[in-house]
């Protein structure tokens, strides 16, 4: 059943309901297996981020940027920011230095979270021209920092650094107040367009917009806590972002595909019951099926044709 609470409180509320049940899963490329993250762990990380950002002095509706490929940490930062009524702005992981510079300055970003080496290198290269940038926080511990970099910190060190002295009553009270004050008119995200017709434009999305989208989707295509989602499109894409959040409201398991090239492998491993993708992806899947059919035996070709017809009758006719 869909949880209709405000997104700023969603993960905390779902953790009360689902506890140690897996909320997220991601592939560990060193261990070569999928690692689950429980709702309880998810909520703990979200609250840590909220308190760490508050300790840094992040203001209500201040913009925070995330420059990363899909990772569980992006969810931690998103929902941690929502918990203190800050606004998150995701950048495409392939954005150029010029694009990053423009968005950082346009949104007056003080704190930038980055994913892996390519994003860090790009972010570090624009420090001198990013007028408001104060800190870069790096998700991936394997990133090699520039020897002259005195602005960056690893994500786990950032949390430990900000919370090392404990949480004061004043900080905790401010956190509780912001959670209580969160409303549907607050800005949730700013998503920058691709910039194909000039400079990128920042599209402002409120919590109320997401809430209405969830309501409509639930009426047309209801989901449940038994569903398994596979994240494929970047979280910068509003289709994927809204779909991910929809899954979280339903209590479904989200499998985070870290590398786009691995999506077919991920599908075979996690067996998603639902996912969103652009038409080009399904065209490629369909073409692969046709090629396999042409190279198969008579019986294999017959079975594939029959399966396609069944799908067509069910979904199209």
Language-model segments: residues:
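Structural core segment of the AMP-binding/adenylate-forming
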Residues: 51, 56, 83-162
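Conserved pre-ATP/AMP-binding loop-to-beta segment of ANL
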Residues: 19-22, 138, 165-192, 199, ...
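Conserved AMP-binding A3 loop
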Residues: 36-39, 188-214
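Flexible, low-complexity linker/hinge segments
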Residues: 1-5, 120, 147-187
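Conserved AMP-binding/adenylation subdomain of ANL enzymes
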Residues: 211-228, 235-317
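Conserved AMP-binding/adenylate-forming core of the ANL superfamily
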Residues: 24-71, 78-79, 96-101, 154-157, ...
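A short N-terminal helical cap/helix-turn-helix that marks the beginning
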Residues: 2-25, 44
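A short helix-loop-beta submotif of the ANL/AMP-binding
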Residues: 62-63, 69-89, 93-97, 105-111, ...
